[in-house]
Amino acid sequence: PVVAVCKELRASCEHELRFWCDRKFGASARGIFGKFDETIPVELIIAGKVRRYHGKSMVFHLHPSILLPNIRDVFLVGIGFIQSFCKLLRWRPDVILIKGGYVCLPVGYAARLLKIPLVLHDSDAHPGLTNRLLAPFAAKIGTGAPLEHYNYPDVKAEYVGIPVAEEFRPYSAAERRQLKVKFGFDPARPLVVVTGGGLGAARLNEAVIVMREQLLAETSVFLISGKHQ
C-alpha cells in the first residue's frame, strides 16, 4: 500500500519523499523501492515492540522470555524517538504518513513534539496499538474498513479503503481459468486463495486446516503460508 501511495504522490507532485522502516525490513524495503523509484531513500529507525498475548494471564506475561525483551524494547523505543526527532529536526517534512506498526510509534511522538502533521492509515479491521496511541494527534485518519469497525473520531476519520497499485487489476474469467490450470486446479471449481500477512498467520493457517474438509467439499483451496507458520 505504501508503494501505491508513493506512486500517486510522484505523479501529482514534485515533493521529496522518504520511506522509514524498522531495521528488520530494510533490505526488503530497499529492494521494493529500488524497482519502483531509486530516488526515494529508505532510512532505518530503531524501534521496539510490546509483546502482548490476548487471553493469557499476567503471570504468563511476567515470564522472563516475554518480560525481559519488553523491558529491553522500552529502551529501544526511546532510542528510536531520539533518532526520529533528530532526523525530523533536520528534514522538517510537511506531513508524515503513518501506516501502523511499532516502528511508527517513536516517529509519531517525535512528529507530535515538532508539530509536524500526521496522517494515519489503518489497513486492519481492528486498529493496532500504535495507531490507537497516535490517533489523538493525527490530522487525518484513513481506514481500510468501514468506520464502524474503529473508535476513531468521525471528524478526522474517513473510510478510504486499501491503496492498491495500478498493476494489480481484476483478472478476466478466461485468465482465471488459465491460472487454475497452470497451478493444477480444476478450472470448473471455485478457487479460494488464503494468505495472511507478509510471513503468514499461524492462526489463520490453522483455521484453514481445521476446516479443510468443509472447504474442499465445495472449492479448491490455495494456502500461502509464511516460513515456520
What are the language-model segments listed below?
Residues 14, 19-20, 25-27, 49, ...:
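Donor-nucleotide binding loops and adjacent catalytic segments primarily
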Residues 76, 100-103:
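Short, solvent-exposed amphipathic helices
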Residues 39-40, 112-174, 185:
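Active-site-proximal region of nucleotide-activated glycan assembly enzymes
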Residues 70-86, 174-178:
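Glycine-rich, highly charged phosphate/nucleotide-binding loops
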